[in-house]
A protein has these predicted regions:
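Predominantly cytoplasmic-facing regulatory/coupling regions of multi-pass membrane proteins
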Residues: 1-82, 148-261, 300-328
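Transmembrane helix boundary and interhelical junction motifs in multipass membrane proteins
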Residues: 55-58, 91-102, 260-277
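Membrane-interface alpha-helices at helix entry/exit sites of multi-pass transporters
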Residues: 75-76, 93, 98, 108-124, ...
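Extended non-transmembrane interhelical loops and adjacent amphipathic helices
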Residues: 78, 82-109, 196-203
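Mid-bilayer segments of alpha-helical transmembrane spans in multi-pass integral membrane proteins
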Residues: 85, 89-95, 123-135
């Protein structure tokens, strides 16, 4: 059996086990009664939220590619987006997602030298939006973290925003090159060139944005709209069990959850995502239903795009490509 097949089977078993375990440990008899009130409208709302999220994601990708001097068809845009979901789920740290996007872009005549910074900036903009939203999250929502006061959370969030904005400037300076060089020498001397190459790739992406600031700002707005629409999947599913859903609070906590998931060590954030979802959203839904909603959210937001991405990648490159990338 190939490594690709073993990893695919492992991921399927892991996802099934995590989903089953979460439902088993969170459901109760009262929840079984609540399930009978499930309405199809909430599922339709979740599908609309997913479609809108993908729409704005496609718009920003098309605009980024256009800033780089190229053009993507709708079919190409969809392939790039869904390939990210597929390979990110199969590889540790979601590292395969970026590789898949760059290679799919190359198949549509966007060279790797242009595709790499475009993909990197796409990710950077998503993280930047979440970081910038952090102060608003902690101002609006009284999220409690053990041993950390609300004032400290606000201070940390404002510092994170300032560091992010300042970092976009410092990345282009010679001081950052010296810092990265010294850091690479200290930790992995034999990979110093790789570290500097990644910094140069990021700077190339930022240089593209600086050339067209208005278009870049629109890309940032589209990034935020895409993420917020995707985060609306959660409150849409909650409407299946209750009409009293504080949408703004739910979106606030989804921002915090997904920012944490960007740094989750497990493939696709499996296990961590469901656990955090239960911790953050249990107070807002009927007793015993949060596990079902958590699993439904993951299915809608991650697993459905994963299988669409699997079809997109396999029809474009075949099994050899997937086997090669998952073996790295």
């Amino acid at each position: 059996m190939s490594k690709m097949m073993r990893r695919g089977i492992f991921m399927f078993v892991l996802l099934f086990a995590v989903s089953l375990g979460i439902i088993y440990y969170t459901i109760d008899l009262e929840a079984l009664k609540t399930i009978t009130t499930f309405n199809v409208e909430s599922l339709l709302l979740a599908i609309i939220a997913l479609a809108l999220g993908m729409y704005f994601d496609g718009l920003r990708l098309q605009r980024l590619v256009k800033i780089g001097g190229y053009h993507l068809s709708i079919k190409a845009v969809l392939r790039v987006i869904f390939s990210n979901y597929f390979m990110a789920m199969l590889t540790p740290g979601a590292s395969g997602g970026a590789v898949a996007q760059v290679l799919v872009l190359r198949s549509y005549d966007v060279p790797i030298s242009k595709g790499t910074p475009i993909v990197l900036i796409r990710t950077v903009f998503s993280i930047m939006f979440l970081v910038i939203m952090l102060p608003i999250v902690f101002l609006y929502d009284s999220i409690e973290i053990p041993y950390i006061s609300r004032d400290m959370l606000l201070l940390f969030s404002f510092l994170a925003v300032m560091a992010t904005l300042l970092g976009t400037y410092l990345l282009q300076t010679v001081y950052m090159r010296k810092f990265v060089y010294n850091l690479a020498q200290h930790f992995k001397a034999h990979k110093t060139k790789d570290w500097l190459a990644k910094l140069e790739t990021l700077n190339q992406g930022l240089a593209l944005l600086y050339k067209k600031p208005t278009q870049s700002f629109i890309v940032f707005i589209e990034s935020g709209l895409s993420l917020l629409c995707l985060y609306c999947i959660a409150p849409a599913l909650m409407f299946a069990f209750t009409n009293d859903v504080p949408i703004i609070t739910i979106l606030d906590r989804m921002i915090l959850l997904n920012l944490i998931l960007y740094f989750a060590p497990t493939p696709g954030g499996t296990g961590i995502a469901e656990g955090l979802f239960i911790l953050l959203f249990a107070p807002f839904v009927p007793s015993g239903t949060v596990g079902i909603i958590a699993v439904a959210w993951r299915v809608m937001a991650e697993y459905v795009p994963f299988f669409i991405g699997m079809y997109a990648v396999l029809t474009l490159y075949g099994r050899q490509f997937v086997a090669q990338e998952t073996s790295n």
